[in-house]
């Protein structure tokens, strides 16, 4: 069992409060995963220029997408988060090794992601154990300078890109440095030439919440992530065995 520092404890408390509030079904304050936040948005109907809604939606989307790749994460973003939006662990079912601690910084920025964001993630990791994996999850592309900053960092880091179109949201880029490779020597990525299960499948089409409402909510992120061609999804592979779900 590993001991977590203050950042993990802060997130744990946040999650506990959310679970308590969830029982009240007060959608103005109740959300702790992608589905509950989409329900919240369907009531609030925020403007597509609402950056807070954009950022929060992307954090929950990253949480959902990375869960398909064996990351168990909880959201702790907000005031005083130190640049960390999700915390948790990476563990592979039926594989006996100690779960790896993970912190994730999510950037829904439009445009390229430069080295400043990688350095900010490095700074955020300073209050966590040295074997904690830091992931920078983004909509935009990484510059060559950001990839160089990743490669020379002395902390285990990974860069991840997410594609969003409302029905299919998935990871299509995942790169890590030598420090991360030392932790996961048998882990690799592989392209798959088929789309993962539709993200829309996770939303219950009951009560007043319809699939049409769900898809329209992703307009908050679509203009930021639209590309000319749909990128090829990735899966994670451990010792030649695919460990990603729904792919």
UniProtKB/Swiss-Prot annotation:
Superkingdom to which the source organism belongs: Eukaryota
Subcellular location: Mitochondrion
Gene Ontology biological-process entries: double-strand break repair
Major localisation: mitochondrion
Any Pfam family: RRG7
Record-annotated disulphide pairs: none
Keyword Protease attached: no
Annotated SUPFAM superfamilies: Restriction endonuclease-like
UniProt entry keywords in alphabetical sequence: Mitochondrion
Name the record gives this protein: Uncharacterized protein C824.03c, mitochondrial
Lineage of the species this protein comes from: Eukaryota, Fungi, Dikarya, Ascomycota, Taphrinomycotina
